[in-house]
Amino acid sequence: MHIEARLFEFVAAFFVVTAVLYGVLTSMFATGGVEWAGTTALALTGGMALIVATFFRFVARRLDSRPEDYEGAEISDGAGELGFFSPHSWWPIMVALSGSVAAVGIALWLPWLIAAGVAFILASAAGLVFEYYVGPEKH
């Protein structure tokens, strides 16, 4: 997780420096002064990247080092089982379609379509999470 933390720290620094430069340059060359929408968006993007970097730093302290954290690591060092993967599941497609329905409802401001999209998102997310769950009474 050290590599991921360092990556997001560089991204955060880039966006903060970009926000400062953008604010200074728009105040110097724009007719209306500082363009606050872009400056605020860049600053908030840098802040969000810093939040993610901080989270990865805290996680990296609690976990053991991974092969990705070593400079001289080989691809074979990370070999092994990574976890369960369901290649034939339809639920991710249903979650994406449900999110699309909700996004179209928001874009067109149709409250009934927003409600339907949110309901579909909840149902499809539950289907995704509980796809392989078999209750104690079913054997």
UniProtKB/Swiss-Prot annotation:
Pfam families associated with the record: Cyt_c_ox_IV
Gene Ontology MF term list: cytochrome-c oxidase activity
Keywords, sorted A to Z: Cell membrane, Membrane, Translocase, Transmembrane, Transmembrane helix
E.C. numbers: 7.1.1.9
Membrane-related topology note: Multi-pass membrane protein
Membrane-traversing stretches: 10-30, 36-56, 78-98, 101-121
GO cellular component, one term: plasma membrane
Gene Ontology BP annotations: electron transport chain
Main location group: membrane
Reaction equation(s) it catalyzes: 4 Fe(II)-[cytochrome c] + O2 + 8 H(+)(in) = 4 Fe(III)-[cytochrome c] + 2 H2O + 4 H(+)(out)
Family per record: Belongs to the cytochrome c oxidase bacterial subunit CtaF family.
Subunit note: Associates with subunits I, II and III to form cytochrome c oxidase.
Name of the featured protein: Probable cytochrome c oxidase polypeptide 4
Organism the protein comes from: Mycobacterium tuberculosis (strain ATCC 25618 / H37Rv)
